[in-house]
Swiss-Prot record:
Belongs to the RecO family. The keyword Membrane does not apply. HAMAP family: RecO (MF_00201). This is DNA repair protein RecO. Involved in DNA repair and RecF pathway recombination. Pfam families: RecO_C, RecO_N. Signal peptide: none annotated.
């Protein structure tokens, strides 16, 4: 019998009343368990196996699917559960984590990062910025290490910088002519990309960013992921459509 602290990142129906639950845990990394009877509303496993739930879990099992015996909810992130926009961002965070990691490879830092991101989304901090921070933090997990602290070509740390997927990082104005396909980004966007990649989440504080800046950030991050990660995430397309819808609603309310 194993015990762990984990976050439910995916659930699927299994047979008439069971679920297969994918969790990312502090102790074991990503694991899968069968939760028998969890689809029944009166089941003792119903609440603890809801998507995004953070809890303590006890299960039997080895390298394959385990069997969940019991669970205790630590945090169910109720605000996320009740808000369609928050849900979309949290779903993307969990799918990215699922696709970027292998079974049973513990990474306590990644567990804590995911928990902090979900908690901050639930508490009402900007979900788009939090998700962008998470995307930048996940790059090393995917084996991607863009050069963000100096020019990726010449190594200079001063000057004007653009972002280059071809050169795998930022490049200074001295090297612009070496990559005509580079992304010309506003200076504050380059600084934020660097901050998101290098600084710890708890040191960033509450960042107030204009929508135009967030759009630039998203363009740069999406381009880098598309050209380097090899991932296709269904939740990302849905999330981008949601972003457009949310921006339209905000614009209408401001008029």
């Amino acid at each position: 019998m194993e015990k762990c602290e984990g976050i439910v990142i995916r659930q699927t129906s299994y047979r008439e009343s069971d679920k297969i639950v994918r969790m990312y845990t502090r102790e074991f990394g990503k694991i899968g368990v069968v939760a028998r009877g969890a689809k029944k509303t009166k089941s003792r496993l119903a609440a603890v196996t809801q998507l995004f739930t953070n809890g303590y879990f006890t299960f039997f099992g080895g390298n394959g699917l385990g069997t969940l015996q019991q669970g205790e909810v630590i945090e169910n992130f109720s605000s996320i559960q009740q808000d369609i926009f928050m849900t979309a961002y949290a779903t993307y965070v969990c799918e990215l984590l699922d696709k970027a990691t292998e079974e049973r490879q513990p990474n306590p830092y990644l567990y804590e990062l995911t928990f902090q991101i979900l908690r901050d989304i639930d508490e009402g901090y900007d979900p788009q910025i939090l998700t962008q921070i998470y995307e930048m933090k996940m790059l090393p997990v995917l084996g991607l290490y863009p050069t963000m602290d100096k020019c990726a070509i010449c190594g200079e740390t001063t000057g004007h910088f653009d972002f280059s997927t071809r050169s795998n990082g930022i490049i200074c104005h001295r090297c612009f002519e070496k990559d005509r396909y580079r992304m010309h980004l506003p200076e504050n966007v380059v600084k934020l990309l660097r901050l998101f990649f290098i600084f710890q989440l708890d040191r960033l504080g509450n960042i107030d960013v204009k929508q135009e800046t967030k759009d630039w950030l998203q363009k740069a991050i999406d381009t880098y992921y598309d050209e380097n990660s090899g991932l296709y995430l269904k939740s990302r397309k849905f999330l981008r459509d949601m972003d457009k819808w949310e921006n339209m609603l905000k614009k209408d309310s401001d008029d």
